[in-house]
Amino acid sequence: GVNAIELMPNSEFEGNSSWGYNPSFHMALDKYYGTPDKFKEFVDSCHSRGIAVITDQVYNHAYGQNPIAQMWWDGTNNRPAADNPYMNQNCPHPPNCWGNDFDHYVQPTRDYMDRINTYWIEEFKIDGIRFDFTKGFTNNSNADNYSAPRIAALKRLADTLWGVDQDFYVILEHWGPNNEEKELSDYGMMLWGNVAHAYYEAAMGFTSNSDFKWGIYKERGWNDKHLISYTESHDEERASYKIKTYGNSSGSYDTRTLATMADRKILTHAFLYTIPGPKMMYMFEELAYDISIDNPCRICEKPILWSYYENNHRQKVYFYTAALIEMRKKYGVFNTDNFTYALNGGAKRINLSTTDTNATVVGNFRVTAGDVYPNFQHTGTWYDYFTGDSIVVTNATAPMTYQPGEWHVYTDVKLNKASFIGEEEMELAATNVAVYPNPSSGNVELLVDVAEGTDVRYQVYDITGKSVHEGNFNAALYRVEYMDLNHLSSGAYLLKIQAGSAVYNERLLIE
């Protein structure tokens, strides 16, 4: 379901390990991202899969290795010199100051940005740029106020980009006043919308400060779906870490257990991806990544835990997230302009409508059972997208009692049941399954020990979630199935086996 990859700054930064927000050479590819030819291969590979590539450029500032700073430098005061044609001597908008501040109102800085952006587009064929901290594109000491010169500078920047590629994605991390962000959105730019903290509270089961409606473009009074909302980013703590460390509980229902934490993560995704407009997922969020941002330090490298694919609770998050994204891509009702919502408190809902389909998303974010109010658009038969079951609604405004963490997506038109999701899935014990050899050169034996006559289905997914091989058989007591996977490239895959209502997942390595 992913249709764009947004990288952190990949131009040359100071040091060997960094997020990249300490830029030194904006036009040079940092070695951490490979050689230029390898990076081009990456872009081409993404494009062949229908995935756009978006890079991150930091033009608010540059650090000391940058030649523009060094050529006009005041060594006595350790800052850009008064005659520096690109940079301010002092950052004019504290406290948000890093490195050496660019003056975005002078022509040399504009030319510098334009030449670099054009190079990245024409040389590497990137599809968009996320511009870091564009609220800093001002010389005003109060950057939180509306700034007409800043607006003009950003519109000029966007126009230049669209002159090179009319379909180019211009994304701003702006954090400016809403009237300014609305004007930029109206002009065609997209903007980051951080609602992580409200989603944290909802996921942890603390509902008094859990209203995440600010992640909806309509709530801000915007005309277009240009708000990129998200529950996690590089700047925020991992939601799963927050849940497992600080989550709420009541009786036997404890959000801090792995199983319930995973369910709470799915719950929040159900109320992120069903909101119309672009959404962003941070890496491994689909597997409930729960290593703290501060472990061992904020900008330190974090472990890549491929073993998460072998955990059934994390796999559940992965598959439900994939199904939610597939649903929003496949059915237009989840991209409608006609929707309402009630997201305060423990009972939350989203109601979406088109001329031919209505959808209602409803969930209980409390840690206790309680009433929710779906506010169905009409009475009659409604269908649960994830179970395939139906309900008959006789009173559209009547409450329903949900268990803690329970949620549903209802539609008044029967849609194809979500892929990846079976009935209430039970774990198929590892003692009932053998996969040999693993790692494999391509020929794999699958041995399944289940009741005779059981229907067994198996699928192999690549790391993007795409099904690359599948099959099914009717099991004898101990059935050996041979899988020819020689057509697959070397790498890690997920093998999912479903026998009746039982499921088994195993990481499969092709050498």
Named regions from a protein language model:
Residues 2-126, 130-149, 153-165, 169:
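Substrate-binding/active-site clefts of carbohydrate-active enzymes
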Residues 398, 408, 479-483:
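Short strand-edge motifs at loop-to-beta-strand transitions and within beta-strands
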Residues 415-422:
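Short, compositionally biased serine/threonine- and acidic-rich segments at solvent-exposed termini, linkers
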Residues 127-131, 279-285:
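Active-site regions of oxyanion-processing enzymes, predominantly non-cytosolic
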Residues 241-258, 298-304:
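A solvent-exposed, charged loop/short amphipathic helix patch at secondary-structure junctions
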Residues 426-511:
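C-terminal outer-membrane/trafficking sorting elements
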Residues 49, 225-226, 396-397, 431, ...:
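Short loop/turn microsegments at loop-to-beta-strand junctions
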Residues 9-11, 21-22, 47-51, 133-231, ...:
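Active-site-proximal helices and loops of the catalytic beta/alpha 8
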